[in-house]
UniProtKB/Swiss-Prot annotation:
Coiled coil: none annotated. The keyword DNA-binding applies. Keywords: DNA replication, DNA-binding, Primosome. GO terms for biological process: DNA replication, synthesis of primer. Involved in the restart of stalled replication forks, which reloads the replicative helicase on sites other than the origin of replication. Can function in multiple replication restart pathways. Displaces ssDNA from a PriB-ssDNA complex. Probably forms a spiral filament on ssDNA. It comes from the Bacteria. InterPro entries: DnaT, DnaT_DNA_bind. Belongs to the DnaT family. This is Replication restart protein DnaT. The lineage of its organism: Bacteria, Pseudomonadati, Pseudomonadota, Gammaproteobacteria, Enterobacterales. Homooligomerizes. Interacts with PriB. Component of the replication restart primosome. Primosome assembly occurs via a 'hand-off' mechanism. PriA binds to replication forks, subsequently PriB then DnaT bind; DnaT then displaces ssDNA to generate the helicase loading substrate. GO terms for cellular component: primosome complex.
Amino acid sequence: MKILISDNISLELFCKNPIKILEKSNKGIIGVLKNKSPIFYVITPYILKKIFDLECNLLDLDKTKQQISKKFSMHPQWTPDKDFIRQAALWGITLTEEILESELASFISYWQAEGCFFHHIQWQQKLARSLQKSRSISYMSQKKRDITYIPTPDQTVPNGFRGK
């Protein structure tokens, strides 16, 4: 299972006060590094329960059998499974946030117009890839640099070079 880890910390800093560092983490997951490579991961009990709590994510057997047994075209009432983010992680697609209603509505309206028929699991995989792509595009657009910025050089001469 792939999980996106945004917080990394060195082993030395982590050993000083691990509980405080874990409490400060954004997502409750920290990668502990030694020589810039991960040696282990630390996960809060809440996040661990959220990832592996299968009991609360069980679906009705009838609904599952119906969805597995035949293909269908996209319709406005379609929703992904409750454990969709965990399933996406199993498919190698890391989703860090829940699905927004606007994202789901956009996906449904696009595929309704297409009129394609797929199994429920295939629709979920398409949704996961769509979310991954759209979120990465919006993330990349936030990181764009200002093309009108003109850098000004500093006037320092490094040691070992001839200068003023």
